[in-house]
Design a protein with these regions (language model features):
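Amphipathic alpha-helical linker/stalk segments
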Residues: 2, 58, 62-87, 114-118, ...
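Solvent-exposed, amphipathic alpha-helical segments
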Residues: 17-25, 67-78, 152-159
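Hydrophobic alpha-helical connector segments
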Residues: 73-104, 111-112, 121, 146-149
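An amphipathic alpha-helix signature
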Residues: 86, 90, 121, 125, ...
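Short secondary-structure transition hinges
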Residues: 94-137, 163-167
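Hydrophobic/aromatic-rich alpha-helical bundle segments in the mid-to-C-terminal region
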Residues: 108, 114, 133-180, 185-204, ...
Length: 215
């Protein structure tokens, strides 16, 4: 089959099915025969779109980061950088809930072109830098703060999907931890709550439960 004759829907279906098999059953479950059965195509179709299983695994990870990037890119910069960071957190959670099979695998397989993953993290680093430049956070190296925010979001989402936290507990925990981090970075508590509330209403459609006191 020539490249022009390739069907992007089949390629996407192969990636989705591979992500599901990898996430639910591990790498040993990813075979051409099982993948073809999942998608309802021939084993040769796998090699039409990918050079082999290793390339497919890398492409699954790349696709996960591409989808995350699309959600993050949908958050424009505003004049409130803490709102923007909160909105990025909402976008991160929405992507994880929507594309969880890809999400579970994308951090386990390191794509050869690291720019795919690094670009998404750089968006968070830039968001922290903007908050520092605006005087909301104390000025310092933005990398540690961005790392803490990412670890928070990733950990809470993972615990929710593992059944350890209900959705309400997930949202409340995320909100309270973010508030503690924002104020720890130097933001005024009331200003942080106002920024976070606006972002919550944008991504979740309603305000979260009353905010707990920052530690």
């Amino acid at each position: 089959m020539s490249p022009k004759a390739q069907d992007p829907q089949v390629r996407s279906a192969l990636i989705e099915a591979a992500a599901r098999l990898l996430a639910e059953h591990g790498p040993d479950a990813l075979t051409t025969r099982r993948l073809a059965t999942e998608v309802g195509t021939s084993t040769m179709a796998v090699y039409t779109y990918f050079a082999g299983m290793e390339e497919l695994r890398r492409e699954v990870a790349r696709e996960g980061f591409r989808r995350l990037a699309a959600y993050l890119d949908a958050v424009p910069d505003s004049d409130d950088p803490v709102y923007d960071l909160s909105a990025l957190g909402g976008a991160y959670m929405t992507n994880a809930f929507t594309n969880f099979d890809l999400y579970r695998f994308m951090f386990l397989e390191n794509p050869e072109d690291d720019d795919v993953g690094e670009g998404t993290f750089e968006r968070l680093v830039r968001g922290v830098q903007r908050a520092m430049e605006a005087g909301r956070f104390e000025k310092s190296d933005p990398l540690p703060a961005a790392t803490q925010l990412w670890v928070m979001a990733h950990g809470v989402v993972t615990l929710h999907k593992a059944g350890c936290l209900t959705l309400d507990e997930t949202l409340t925990t995320m909100r309270d931890m973010a508030l503690n981090l924002f104020t720890g970075f130097g933001d005024d508590k009331d200003a942080a709550i106002e920024s976070m509330t606006k972002a919550t209403e944008l991504f979740l459609g309603a305000a979260l439960p009353p905010t707990a006191e920052a530690v």
